[in-house]
Amino acid sequence: MEQHTSNPTKEKAKEEDSVACFCPAKSSPSYIDLPANFTPANFLTIQTKLSSGAGQKPKGCLGVLECMYANLQLQTQLAQRQIAILENLQASLSQPGSGRESKNCSLPGLCCKLLLNHLPQFHK
């Protein structure tokens, strides 16, 4: 009686062969207008020469990685700008004589010093 035993290594190799690269994503509703001379390669240099043999990825995958890296760079810049805005706001609220007396606070029941204590401290 002949038993058929499956080889897990061969099955895994078949799965890897059937995996395809992702297609480029469609534009997002939160569209960011990039400069006309933008190229993802400016942000990331990838060594495209892979070792010979199995396991080589199509060049399209590298393009996706470059776009993801560029997206992370843009998100980092935006986050840094937001932190700078919050730091400026915090500094302006903590200046003495800014005309903001606790009795003139616009939020009922809270004074501006209480608000300052609840603002997170940001460090560069």
From Swiss-Prot:
GO CC terms, sorted: cytoplasm
Tissues where the protein occurs: In testis, expressed in the inner luminal layer of the seminiferous tubules.
Gene designation per UniProt: Tsacc
GO molecular function: Hsp70 protein binding; protein kinase binding; protein kinase inhibitor activity; protein-folding chaperone binding
InterPro entries recorded: SSTK-IP
Family: Belongs to the TSACC family.
Pfam families: SSTK-IP
Keywords annotated in UniProt: Chaperone
Domain of life: Eukaryota
Role this protein plays: Co-chaperone that facilitates HSP-mediated activation of TSSK6.
Subunit field text: Interacts with HSP70. Associates with HSP90. Interacts with TSSK6; this interaction is direct and recruits TSACC to HSP90.
The protein, known as: TSSK6-activating co-chaperone protein
